[in-house]
Amino acid sequence: MMDKAIFNGLGRRKTSVARVYIVSGNGKLTINDKIFASAEEYFKDRVRARHAFEPLVVTNNDGKLDVFVRVEGGGLSGQAGAVRLALARALIKMDTSFKPVLKSHGMLSRDPRMVERKKYGLRKARRAPQYSKR
């Protein structure tokens, strides 16, 4: 049996869903069963990687926890947002004293913005066909 406590969190953003499991450790990062030295390798961008793992930085747990991430759906930006929310929720399960800090940084709110559906008679969700006067 495992002797370390595992804390989990679920996060969603656009069409992405992320499940994060954190265990006390030395900062090992595993995303979709692949071990990465840094989040930038997966997200291919420093900004998205920093955004996704910001909860660890804000709570001073960067490098102190092993993070296991399962993320699917959407693109890299949506996945980064999903990981961020899931990680924040997992940190709160680990230690409830992190809640005010994470809440003040806006990391506990699920971003409700979704892609608007295309309507019939239009070219896109709101883009109408070009109007011809004559």
From Swiss-Prot:
* One GO term (biological process): translation
UniProt GO molecular function: RNA binding; structural constituent of ribosome
Q: Cellular component GO terms, alphabetically? A: cytoplasm; small ribosomal subunit
Sorted alphabetically, which keywords does the UniProt record give? Ribonucleoprotein, Ribosomal protein
Q: Does the keyword Ribosomal protein apply?
A: yes
Q: Which Gene3D superfamilies match?
A: 3.30.230.10
The residue range of the signal peptide is none
Q: Which cysteines are joined by disulfide bonds?
A: none
Question: Family per UniProt?
Answer: Belongs to the universal ribosomal protein uS9 family.
**What is the recorded name of this protein?**
Small ribosomal subunit protein uS9
Species of the source? Pseudothermotoga lettingae (strain ATCC BAA-301 / DSM 14385 / NBRC 107922 / TMO) (Thermotoga lettingae)
Highest lineage ranks of the organism? Bacteria, Thermotogati, Thermotogota, Thermotogae, Thermotogales
This protein's gene is called rpsI
